[in-house]
């Protein structure tokens, strides 16, 4: 794609149209966080990817409806595109994802909506600098 790195981003259902996020989700029983990353990327973007390496964790407190506070740890991984067409989502995924698209990695700090995800995109960019496309 023109000699640039891209990342697969999603526009979550029920959020404002300006919200762009990285694919993520809950770890299923018997699954590792790395396996979750590959599965969620496929479900939420329509892409098959290979695990490259872990970028890091984002820790935060989420407040649910009703005021319950939940501590969350989200693990992010660098994945390498294998195949698929972005936006061809798994059946039923419209409940979670309204749209998926490629976004330029060098624009992540302006495009991603969440600070922790912007940090992970910057880590990915630093890791990929000088690496062959």
What function would you assign to each model-found segment?
Residues 116, 125, 129-133:
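Short, charged, intrinsically disordered terminal tails
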Residues 46-85:
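Active-site segment of metal-dependent pyrophosphate-handling enzymes
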Residues 22-55:
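The catalytic Nudix box helix
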Residues 1-22:
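N-terminal strand-loop-strand
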Residues 21, 71, 102:
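Short aromatic/basic micro-patch
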Residues 1-2, 13-14, 80-85, 105-107:
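Short loop segments at secondary-structure junctions
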Residues 8-12, 49, 108:
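Conserved short hydrophobic patches within well-ordered secondary structure
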Residues 76, 88-121:
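NUDIX/MutT-family hydrolases
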């Amino acid at each position: 794609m023109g000699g640039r790195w891209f990342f697969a981003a999603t526009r979550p259902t029920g959020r404002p149209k300006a919200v762009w996020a990285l694919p993520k989700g809950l770890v299923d029983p018997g699954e590792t966080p790395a396996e979750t990353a590959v599965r969620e990327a496929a479900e939420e973007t329509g892409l098959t990817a290979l695990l490259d390496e872990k970028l890091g964790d984002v820790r935060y407190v989420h407040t649910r409806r009703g005021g319950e506070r939940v501590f969350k740890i989200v693990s992010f991984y660098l994945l390498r595109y294998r195949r698929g067409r972005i936006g061809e989502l798994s059946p039923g995924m419209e409940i979670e994802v309204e749209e998926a698209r490629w976004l330029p990695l060098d624009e992540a700090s302006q495009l991603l909506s969440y600070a922790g995800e912007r940090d992970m995109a910057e880590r990915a960019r630093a890791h990929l600098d000088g690496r062959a496309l």
